Amino acid sequence: DKTLSPNYMQKPLFDAYDIDEDIFWSEVNALPDYYKRAGISVQRDTCYLGHLLSYVRAGRMPGLTNARLRELGAGIEFFAGIPELFSALRASIALPHYEEHDIRLEHYVVSTGLVEMIRGSRIADYLDGIYGSEFIEEPAQPGYDRAHAPKHGLVSQIAGFLDNTTKTRALFEINKGVNKEPGIT
């Protein structure tokens, strides 16, 4: 949504696969009305995820894996001063006056964007956590072996997503410490 970057964070993905960004977003913006004709309601701010998977299935994004998304994250352009701002803010509270009061500063990205691309970006090392949208590569099949890790492959399903309302839930979880202490409910 252009909070930390002058471009949509998916731009390096579109550039890598020679996808016209304007056409992609135009298609995405038309999807709610398109699916409404079939009686299906889609989330406006996250339906782009399913459309990315349509591009993968159509062969327009060959070889798109979570690892590839992470690689492409290195190409996300940030506004001037980002990521330096993160370390400057941390340094500003690394003073005895703040430490004696146990004041801590944590940085999180809460986004409808792609977690793997953020993990591969220049800001990842400055973050305490990333909340966003993720893909499954090889889905578990009926009767899958629970003792083994999932296999790798092309992204094929949406694992989870944040939309503009669930971002608020993520903020409450961070505030409460659920991300640090899973036993907290």
Question: How does the language model describe each region?
Answer:
Residues 122, 130-185:
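Conserved acidic, metal-coordinating active-site core of Asp-based
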Residues 1-145:
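Alpha-helical substrate-recognition element adjacent to the catalytic core
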